[in-house]
């Protein structure tokens, strides 16, 4: 595809890069291929930060283990994905924390560790901060994984079936099973306060938020 569609004069590849069926293509294969097709090849070494190699594998592990800030730093951008707003149980609204239930568009979407996150969503070009819970909602005895976000500011109507972009900025805490709904609401208020403090920093700019 690369050769047919782009006719490259030079290919830049990482030293440990693999590709193709069952990752059978490696740098040695690429060297032979480029030589036979009169294409220049530049092999670059690993990018490091404090002797730690920055790689896609490491970034995936960071996301899956909840180290979102570090993952975003290594990505050089904010980890996020597209999701469709789907119908939920309506419980959040009863708790005075209405949420939009999200279904990732990609079937095999990489998802973060279960927990509560400070997020930013792009909805019809509008940027809205919020707090997101990814988990099974153990307080209510449920077992299905649910991704839901409470957006700060005025409640947005008619979000169902909309496609939004959701970014994970900070991990706030683990998902907890509370002994009562009142205890859950009390914690949600603390989470919101925490997220609003972070929101103020992010509104000053991404660099300020990481200091």
Predicted regions and their residues:
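Classical nucleotidyltransferase
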Residues: 1-98, 124, 179-183
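Phosphate/ribose-recognition catalytic cores of enzymes acting on nucleotide-derived substrates
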Residues: 88-211
């Amino acid at each position: 595809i690369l050769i047919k569609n782009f006719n490259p004069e030079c290919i830049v590849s990482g030293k440990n890069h693999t590709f193709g069926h069952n990752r059978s293509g490696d740098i040695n294969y690429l060297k032979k291929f480029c030589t036979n097709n009169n294409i220049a090849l530049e092999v670059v070494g690993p990018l490091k930060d404090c002797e730690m190699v920055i790689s896609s594998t490491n970034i995936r592990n960071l996301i899956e283990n909840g180290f979102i800030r570090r993952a975003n730093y290594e990505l050089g951008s904010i980890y996020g994905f597209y999701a469709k707003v789907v119908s939920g149980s309506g419980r959040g609204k009863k708790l005075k924390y209405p949420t939009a239930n999200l279904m990732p568009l990609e079937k095999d979407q990489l998802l973060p560790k279960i927990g509560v996150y400070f997020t930013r969503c792009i909805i019809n070009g509008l940027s809205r901060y919020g707090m997101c819970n990814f988990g099974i909602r153990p307080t209510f005895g449920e077992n299905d994984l649910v991704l839901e976000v409470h957006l700060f500011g005025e409640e947005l109507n008619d979000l169902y079936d909309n496609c939004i972009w959701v970014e994970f900025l900070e991990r706030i805490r683990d998902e907890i099973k509370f002994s009562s709904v009142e205890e859950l609401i009390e914690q949600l208020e603390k989470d919101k306060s925490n997220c609003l403090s972070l929101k103020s920093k992010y509104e000053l700019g991404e660099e300020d938020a990481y200091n």
